[in-house]
């Protein structure tokens, strides 16, 4: 197990560069096996999830070469093999192999997916999509077995009951080489969907409407990667550093961002009174003055991202007066970080899955646990604000989602280390 040790209370300043989007990367890597030629991904974040996905690729005899931020994937000798449940359970996003394997081989056998414990995240919409394309889906011995008919997958009209990012991506990957046209209605509109579609289109796919609620896919015979693909910047990492800069920054510039991907989040941060200057691809966050409380309500994109409700919580604690309210409409039970913040002296409560935040003028270090990625980010920010030493157990969860986090925090002046225990 990894621990993050933070000696907090020190103002941070300087520059930080945002890595490639985790939520794109964990789909693009499985999608690479759809190509008949080697794939090059640029701007790949150095996160544990990437290492885990490369391990899964090695199970299929797919060669990977990861140098700095460039990942080369060679599927020339790929073999169709079941993916082990143990590794799948440690990485929820590995469910993207369902769509990729089904699209490439007409069959996928994967262990039940795992990942962060933030409440129910059923894959029923993924299965509904696969079945609409003609596949059969079975659950056997902790495995999901998805099989295309002998005549191959056929395009279909698929209406999602909610705009699920995972289901949208999986259906795109499964249908990109299906016969005929596939239409996804009520599709997710996140930037990462557009990134996946761009990647596949550059390999010869025909995908239109990504980023809107209706996506149309015309099946093609095969896909071949021709040019490197640069992954979009991580809007969740960027939003986390915006909160950090406002909480305890003494002037921080955040590079490699796409501002429009953060519109809803930045509007809320600025509503609190944080002053931000935006350039073409960077943000400068000024030291915060007196801030006011706000209400945050998460929603599907382009609304306030559920992955940013926890990182913004320490910033709410710094407000001078009033009561802040956080309502997560996407994952209402995403409140596991609240008892941990209370250990640090935070005046914060949960009532019926609604988070109530009150001004807290002093946080103290404590021994806390990161139950999942974004809860870990929240506790990390609180630890940087707090006086004394904070020890975050299960810090591996933070490393799953944040590119070179220890190095980046140190460059801003933080006293932080990650150790194995």
Swiss-Prot record:
Compartment(s) where it occurs, according to its Swiss-Prot or TrEMBL record: Cytoplasm
Gene3D superfamilies to which the protein is assigned, alphabetical: Enolpyruvate transferase domain
Record GO biological process: cell division; cell wall organization; peptidoglycan biosynthetic process; regulation of cell shape; UDP-N-acetylgalactosamine biosynthetic process
Alphabetical list of CDD domains matching this protein: UdpNAET
Family to which the UniProt record says this protein belongs: Belongs to the EPSP synthase family. MurA subfamily.
PANTHER family: UDP-N-ACETYLGLUCOSAMINE 1-CARBOXYVINYLTRANSFERASE, UDP-N-ACETYLGLUCOSAMINE 1-CARBOXYVINYLTRANSFERASE 2
Alphabetical list of HAMAP family matching this protein: MurA (MF_00111)
Name under which the protein is recorded: UDP-N-acetylglucosamine 1-carboxyvinyltransferase
């Amino acid at each position: 197990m990894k621990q993050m040790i933070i000696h907090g209370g020190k103002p941070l300043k300087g520059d930080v560069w945002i890595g490639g989007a985790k939520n794109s990367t964990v789909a693009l890597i499985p999608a690479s096996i759809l190509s008949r030629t080697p794939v090059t991904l640029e701007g790949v974040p150095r996160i544990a999830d990437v290492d885990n996905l490369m391990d899964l690729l090695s199970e299929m005899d797919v060669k990977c070469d990861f140098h700095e931020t460039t990942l080369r994937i060679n599927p020339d000798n790929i073999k169709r093999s079941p993916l082990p449940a143990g590794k799948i359970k440690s990485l929820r996003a590995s469910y993207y192999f369902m769509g990729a394997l089904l699209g490439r081989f007409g069959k996928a056998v994967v262990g039940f997916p795992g990942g962060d414990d933030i409440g129910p995240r059923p894959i029923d919409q993924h299965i509904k999509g696969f079945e609409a394309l003609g596949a059969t889906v079975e659950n056997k011995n902790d495995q999901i077995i998805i099989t295309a008919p002998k005549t191959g997958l056929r395009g279909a009209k698929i209406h999602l009951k909610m705009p699920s990012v995972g289901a949208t991506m999986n259906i795109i990957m499964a249908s990109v080489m299906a016969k005929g046209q596939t239409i996804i209605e009520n599709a997710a509109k996140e930037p990462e969907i557009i990134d996946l579609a761009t990647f596949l289109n550059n390999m010869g796919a025909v995908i239109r409407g990504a980023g809107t609620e209706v996506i149309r896919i015309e099946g093609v015979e095969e896909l071949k990667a021709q040019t490197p693909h640069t992954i979009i910047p991580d809007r969740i990492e960027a939003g986390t550093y915006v909160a950090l800069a406002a909480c305890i920054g003494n002037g921080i510039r955040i590079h490699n961002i796409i501002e429009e991907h953060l519109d809803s989040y930045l509007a809320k941060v600025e509503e609190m009174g944080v002053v931000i200057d935006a350039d073409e691809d960077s943000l400068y966050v000024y030291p915060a003055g007196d801030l006011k409380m706000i209400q945050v309500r998460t929603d599907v994109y382009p609304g306030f991202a559920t992955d940013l409700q926890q990182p913004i919580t320490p910033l709410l604690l710094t407000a001078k007066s009033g009561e802040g309210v956080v309502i997560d409409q996407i994952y209402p039970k995403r409140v596991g970080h609240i008892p941990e913040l209370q250990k640090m002296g935070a005046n914060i409560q949960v009532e019926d899955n609604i988070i109530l935040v009150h001004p807290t003028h002093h946080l103290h270090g404590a021994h806390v646990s990161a139950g999942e990625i974004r809860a870990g980010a929240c506790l990390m920010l609180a630890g940087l604000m707090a006086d004394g030493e904070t020890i975050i157990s299960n810090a591996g969860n933070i490393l799953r989602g944040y590119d070179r986090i220890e190095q980046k925090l140190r460059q801003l002046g933080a006293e932080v280390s990650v150790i194995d225990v």
